[in-house]
């Protein structure tokens, strides 16, 4: 299963990158170069420097550094667990795997670095004229921005839109973050149990 998903994701990313290149090649180059705006370089400590450092940065690695440990963890975990053809959710280990998956899922959709990349790419493919250097004012932790970003891929990059639409569900993040879920291994379901609602998610090997 994971090999099929990997191929689908690769095709979707290739489609989005091709669209971005043809829509606004300048912004796409800045996107690939990790163009960002660092407000710290506007500080008074730089006032007497000549020339002053520019807050417009290329190869901005701070976001990558902040996200590096999580990135390495979930890639190692997925490769270790799901590349085996005989993988199954069974017993306590199966429940442990599901809990770790929900944690990884929550972290991905709460990752500011990941969402910044997705947001910038969505603006490029949807035809925004200028590159989004400074996105510091946006609230990245929340459902509205993710849904807004997803919709910008709908026409230009249908493959990526389909993947985001199928993979992002706000209640999974809420279930894990607020401990509002229960795994029923026999029925092969995860129940999200909130005060006013109950949602069932089916899982399979």
Regions found by a protein language model. Give the residues of each.
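Flexible secondary-structure boundary motifs
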Residues: 100-170
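Alpha-helical transition-metal enzyme core signature, strongest for iron centers
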Residues: 67-72, 107, 111, 173-176
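Histidine-centered, metal-coordinating catalytic motifs and their short helical/loop contexts
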Residues: 161-190
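Amphipathic, Lys/Arg-enriched alpha-helical patches that create a basic surface
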Residues: 188-205
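Short, charged/polar, low-complexity loop and linker segments
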Residues: 87-92, 147-158, 196-198
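Phosphate-binding glycine-rich loops and adjacent basic patches that engage nucleotide phosphates
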Residues: 75-80, 132-138, 171-182
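Extended intrinsically disordered or low-complexity regions, especially N/C-terminal cytosolic tails and loops
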Residues: 1-101, 167-168
């Amino acid at each position: 299963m994971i090999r099929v998903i990997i191929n689908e994701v690769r095709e979707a990313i290739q489609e989005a990158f091709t669209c971005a290149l043809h829509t606004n090649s300048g912004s796409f180059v800045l996107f690939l170069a990790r163009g960002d705006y660092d407000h710290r370089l506007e500080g008074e400590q730089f006032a007497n420097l000549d020339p002053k450092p520019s807050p417009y940065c290329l190869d901005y690695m701070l976001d990558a550094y902040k996200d590096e440990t999580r990135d390495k963890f979930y890639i190692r975990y997925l490769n270790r667990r799901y590349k085996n053809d005989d993988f199954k959710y069974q017993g306590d280990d199966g429940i442990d795997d599901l809990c770790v998956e929900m944690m990884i899922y929550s972290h991905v959709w709460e990752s500011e670095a990941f969402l910044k990349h997705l947001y910038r790419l969505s603006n490029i493919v949807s035809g925004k004229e200028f590159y989004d250097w400074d996105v510091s004012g946006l609230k990245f932790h929340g459902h509205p921005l993710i849904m807004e970003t997803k919709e910008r891929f709908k026409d230009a990059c249908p493959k990526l839109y389909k993947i985001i639409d199928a993979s992002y569900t706000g209640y999974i993040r809420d279930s894990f973050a607020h401990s509002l879920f229960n795994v029923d291994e026999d029925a092969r379901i995860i129940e999200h149990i909130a005060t006013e609602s109950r949602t069932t998610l089916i899982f399979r090997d």
